[in-house]
């Protein structure tokens, strides 16, 4: 849903402005051959340095959405993950939580390299700064409901259930929520859960999910705006645009029981 929202944002802007677009997906047999004779290129997702090099051969007027590659100088639109993650964790800490776990995914580029996952990185940074060793409460697999469910079951089976969980996506959070309910853990009384993305289902979970809003559609719209501007320029200098996220408070987080007693 996250990448789909980015794509919808980009396509909506292009359609409204009567700009012709060509869609190409990595799994297509003619993936790169579709991308000839372009005025601009919007690349959504994670790409290897080799793929980025191939795209730049096609056009220097490319913009990459949700790609964090600090040593490669290309046009990028990203979220401010650092501020978002730290705001979410500070919120949990302000409620009195110190045993804060992390459930997330591992992504790979096309050449098999593990992609630098900022949410996990800033979670680790936060715990180090607090002097907390919460490594036993960490599980990483995929960004899916099924993985969230399985990772939560693993924590329950290992008797390593924290008082709060930072979930790197709403899908992961919803899977964890299901596993907790099935094993008679109350949310938020026993375990607080914080998601990430604010997808359309999070307001209707039981309880409604506290989450971090990720501006996916706006990222797509902005990419389309810039790519149309690039088309009229002879030279484009690399830039990074970082959009803010925001904490959405609902009903899945509260003080740990020790603070209430």
Regions found by a protein language model. Give the residues of each.
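Short acidic active-site motifs
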Residues: 28-31, 50-51, 147, 151
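Central regulatory/effector-binding core of bacterial HTH transcription factors
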Residues: 12-48
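Bacterial carbohydrate/catabolite-sensing allosteric modules
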Residues: 5-22, 40, 56-64, 68-261
């Amino acid at each position: 849903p996250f990448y789909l929202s980015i794509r919808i944002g980009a396509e909506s802007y292009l359609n409204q402005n009567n700009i012709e677009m060509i869609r190409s997906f990595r799994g297509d047999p003619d993936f790169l051959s579709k991308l000839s004779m372009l005025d601009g290129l919007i690349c959504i997702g994670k790409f290897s340095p080799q793929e980025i090099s191939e795209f730049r051969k096609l056009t220097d007027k490319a913009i990459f959405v949700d790609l964090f590659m600090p040593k490669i100088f290309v046009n990028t639109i990203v979220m401010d993950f650092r501020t978002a993650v730290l705001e979410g964790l500070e919120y949990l800490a302000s409620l009195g939580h110190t045993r804060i776990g992390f459930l997330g995914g591992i992504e790979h580029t096309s050449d098999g390299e593990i992609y630098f996952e900022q949410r996990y990185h800033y979670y680790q940074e936060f715990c180090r700064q607090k002097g907390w060793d919460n490594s036993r409460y960490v599980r990483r697999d995929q960004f899916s409901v099924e993985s969230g469910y399985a990772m939560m079951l693993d924590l329950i089976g290992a008797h390593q259930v924290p008082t709060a969980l930072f979930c790197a996506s709403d899908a992961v959070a919803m899977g964890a929520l299901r596993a907790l309910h099935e094993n008679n853990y109350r949310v938020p009384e026993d375990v607080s859960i914080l998601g990430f993305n604010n997808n359309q289902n999070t307001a209707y979970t039981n309880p409604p999910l506290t989450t971090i809003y990720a501006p996916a559609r706006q990222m797509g719209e902005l990419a389309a705006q810039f790519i149309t501007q690039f088309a009229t320029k002879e030279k484009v200098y690399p830039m990074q645009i970082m959009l803010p996220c925001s904490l959405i408070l609902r009903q899945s987080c509260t003080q740990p029981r020790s603070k209430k007693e």
